[in-house]
Structures are given as C-alpha cells and as structure tokens.
C-alpha cells in the first residue's frame, strides 16, 4: 500500500460523498473488483465503492449499491489487523478486506467498521 492520508481519501471521495457517509480504505478481494485498492462510502441508504489506481491517487471506477440490495452478508473480524466483509449484490459476489487501523487515517477505519456492524449488518 502506498502511503495514504486522510486528506487524500477525503479529496478522492468528496465529489461522491453524500451526507452522513462513513469512509474507509480497503482492499477488494473478489473477481468483480476493478482494481486492488478502494475507498468505501456508506450511509443508511447507499454503499459506494470507489476503485483507485495503482498509486491510490485517482478514482478509476465507481459502483453504487442500495443497502437493501446487499444480500448474504458476512462479516469476520478475525484478527486485530483487518476485517473481512462479503456480500452478494447485482448478481456478483463482493469481498473486501478492511484494515482496522491505519495510523494516517485516524479513526476513519474504526468509525466505518462500527457503523457497518451497528447499522448495516443483519
């Protein structure tokens, strides 16, 4: 992973972000993924995936899902380093590895994971 900062994440996501959205940096791990780096945005209605280029400096693809369309969700916080969130949507399987802590992002990662567990997961 290239050195990523909160400012970079905010700049890349600002035009795609809706009110009350939580943000995190993740590694997509499915065949449906466009690239191997992504910013995830989530609120009570919508989930947005912003796929990033190799250097995490540019959004190259965007996918949106309605929260109600996320099916067969699974969440695993197996170790202290990262959590795995998977689900099916739009006929495809999606899998994201979300680091639980990235020092340069402050509480961004944990805020996203807490929101996900409390408000989105069944």
Predicted features and spans:
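Anionic N-terminal interaction surfaces
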Residues: 1-40, 122
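Charged, low-complexity, helix/coiled-coil-prone segments
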Residues: 7-18, 49-64, 120
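Acidic, Ser/Thr- and proline-rich intrinsically disordered linker/docking segments
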Residues: 3-4, 57-122
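A generic structural signal for ordered alpha-helices
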Residues: 18, 25, 48-49, 90-94
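Residue-level detector of functional hotspots within protein domains
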Residues: 6-8, 26, 33, 51, ...
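Short, compositionally biased strand/turn segments
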Residues: 36-56
């Amino acid at each position: 992973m290239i050195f990523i900062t909160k400012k970079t994440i905010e700049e890349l996501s600002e035009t795609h972000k809706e009110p009350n959205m939580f943000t995190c940096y993740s590694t997509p791990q499915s065949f449906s993924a466009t690239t191997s780096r992504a910013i995830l945005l989530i609120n009570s209605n919508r989930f947005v995936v912003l796929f990033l280029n190799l250097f995490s400096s540019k959004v190259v693809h965007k996918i949106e899902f309605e929260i109600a369309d996320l099916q067969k969700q699974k969440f695993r916080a197996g170790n202290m380093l990262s959590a795995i969130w998977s689900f099916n949507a739009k006929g495809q399987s999606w899998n994201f590895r979300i680091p639980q802590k990235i020092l340069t992002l402050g509480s961004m990662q944990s805020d996203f994971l807490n929101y996900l567990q409390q408000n989105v997961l069944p």
